[in-house]
Amino acid sequence: MKAKTFRYAVLFTLSIILTGIFSDVAAQPRMRFKANKVIRRTAIVLHAAHKQLRLNKHFTGNFARAVAHQRFARRQYMRGNFRSAIHHSRRARMLARMVIQDNKGMPPKEAEFTGDENAGGKDNPTDAELDADLMKDNPNLKFSDEELMDAALDDVDVDEMVNDK
């Protein structure tokens, strides 16, 4: 009787483990799609912020921070860390929106978070944690809006890399 109970316990444990593994694998394509969408929408907002910054030249460092977070989100996307890519791209969009407002512009409709993107939760990282992640990845990073003002922002979107809309 003891051996039978042990066998059932082992089978039950294995089924729980395998269910967790397969549910995570099934969620990957969905997370990839969501991350792609978030990064693409943020790229639109970043381009609008870039345009507004060139017009009014009100430098706060937020534009450079936004570009750095978006580039980090792109790298995370390429590594398959889709959840991290979403969080960093959302942070980039919030910063880009602040740049637009600081430079007396109207944010585009893509600046608003959709219901899908605005998923709150206790396990979401704070802005400080996201900033720390960014600095841990690149400790020599400097945030200068002036340097980026005339730069081409061709590395903030995922469309050039992968077209999986």
Model-inferred region functions:
Residues 2-3, 20, 85:
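Well-ordered, non-transmembrane segments within structured domains
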Residues 2-12:
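Bacterial N-terminal signal peptides that target proteins for export
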Residues 6, 23-24:
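Short, intrinsically disordered, low-complexity terminal segments
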Residues 11-20:
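Bacterial N-terminal signal peptides
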Residues 25-165:
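Long, charged/polar, soluble alpha-helical segments
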